[in-house]
């Protein structure tokens, strides 16, 4: 029996129908369509809740109810896990004094900074519920824009941008790819865990053996490789792999975050002028690499100014000192200012200049390596195989073992030549008989895509 509550009050005690299942997906849904009958009419409201299979589920939509005969009321309640609360909270930017600003905005930082802002927004609406961060991937710096997203949408944006996944367990939010080996071997046979198995490609995208690959249009010499306007990998703007095996399958890919750059670090700031700072190790004179009629700019990667771009007013290579203009795009919040300013240790890169050949070559090599990784992933059959599995309920009833989303299991099917480890990316569990499972096994959920990385050259 399932007890449905509103606050501390019991609204109804119901017996779920045999077909009711718990549905979970990696970086996705966690819901139950709770169907049941009552001999009387009961009104249910949004955010009524119930404890089901050890988790709290909330009614998020007006329920469906029908009446058959004089006394039989049939209900279906769409209930979601704790993550539904994130969909109620706008993902807003905040400043150092706790003021929140409307979208759009962007941040340039590591995953932990984004997740800290996410948590602050959740606590803004649900201040005393014990929400906290769990594991957060140790990431590169990313520049990510947000426009009218709630916290659940923002969490999915972060998972995609940092090439990882999100997981909410109770009221703890994780941003990482869970890799928990269970030791369970799924195979068919008397007393084994597997009842039926279907193997299929995760998507129908073609392999690629010739990839036309491009980077950003920033910081390129003029002319560049016969008039090309974007970074590429050589005189021929493509990479070939496995053509002898598969023939020619062409595609193209652009990595906008890869371009010739040097990551500078502030070593001192002028105490009398927050617009002036020094990088004692800056390696080249940018005044010799300016583009006619184009203002050189710099973008902060870390620190209070992370994500902001500034025109360079002047540069003195003798002292390796930069002077920048204020960023006045937001008239209500011009930067730098007394609260948000450059500090020693902040990192930045200069753009809208022409970098020397050495930096261009390094960027081309980084682009080539990224393209090879992309092609290898596209062409690896094991990356694209997915398995739909119906589990043997008698096995799980006898052993007491449970399956959890994102856990890894081994699939063994000798006749099909299958012996591989895969993760549970979708999981369906019967509520009345929790030893009945069906699941989908793959390396990654379908919606996870390759994203661009910022390269330090």
Segments (PLM) and residue ranges:
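N-terminal export/assembly leaders
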Residues: 19-29, 93-98, 112-146, 168-176, ...
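Short beta-strand-centered interaction patches in the first periplasmic/extracellular domains
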Residues: 63-86, 129-220, 299-306, 318-330, ...
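Short solvent-exposed strand/turn elements
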Residues: 71-94, 323-341, 434-453
